[in-house]
Amino acid sequence: TFVHVTHDQEEAMTMADTIAVMNEGQIEQMGSPADLYDNPETAFVANFLGQSNLIKGTVSGNDGDNKIVDLFGQKISLRKDRSHAVDSSIYAGIRPEKFRISRLETATSGNILTGGKVEDVSYIGVSTQYQVLMPWGQELMVFEQNDDGVAPFSVGESVNISWEPSFTFGLRGDEDAEAGTEVNPDEDPDEE
C-alpha cells in the first residue's frame, strides 16, 4: 500500500484503486476512479475530475426506482441511487461524452432535452465537440464520437440532446455549480 499525491487527474485515475479528492484540506469524496467519475457526490468532484454539464432542476416526483426531475419544463428520469440531493432542489449532471446529439426529426430514446441550437463545433479527429445553447440560456457541452457516418452538425442547426437515464447523477441544488473548475493563480499546475 502506498499513498501518491498528485494534481494530475488522469494520472490519479489510471494509477489508483482508490482516490480521495480533497478540497481545502478536507476529503470531498473517496472511492474508485469509476465511482468518482460516474457518480460524483459534489459539484467540486464532478468538475475536478473532468467536464460536467450541471443543469439546475427540481425533483417533481418519483417513479419506482427513479426520481422525476423537471429541467426548465422538460422532464427527465434520475435513478434514486445516483442522487445526492437532500431536497427538491437539484443539479442533474451529465458528462459531455454521455450525450447523443440528433436532428429534431430523429427519434431518440432515454432522457431528452429539446430545442437546442448548435453554437460551436470543434472537430478533433476521434470526436466532435459541440456547444449547444438550450432554450433556458445554458450552453451544454457534447462530445460526439465520429463513428456513426453521420455528417457533423453545423453552427445554427437546431438539435435535441438525449442520453441514457443511468448516466445522470444528481447533486444538491444549493451547491456552487462552478466549484472545482477554478485554478488557483498562486499554483503552477506544471510545477512539480
Task: Give names to the regions the model predicted.
Residues 34-38, 46-49:
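Short acidic-hydrophobic catalytic motif
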Residues 18, 30, 39:
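Short, glycine/charged-rich "phosphate-handling" switch motifs in NTP-dependent
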Residues 24-25:
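Conserved ABC ATPase "signature" C-loop
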Residues 52, 62-192:
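Non-catalytic connector elements of ABC transporters
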Residues 13-16, 48:
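Hydrophobic Walker B segment
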Residues 1-5, 7-14, 32, 34-35, 40-41:
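Conserved H-loop
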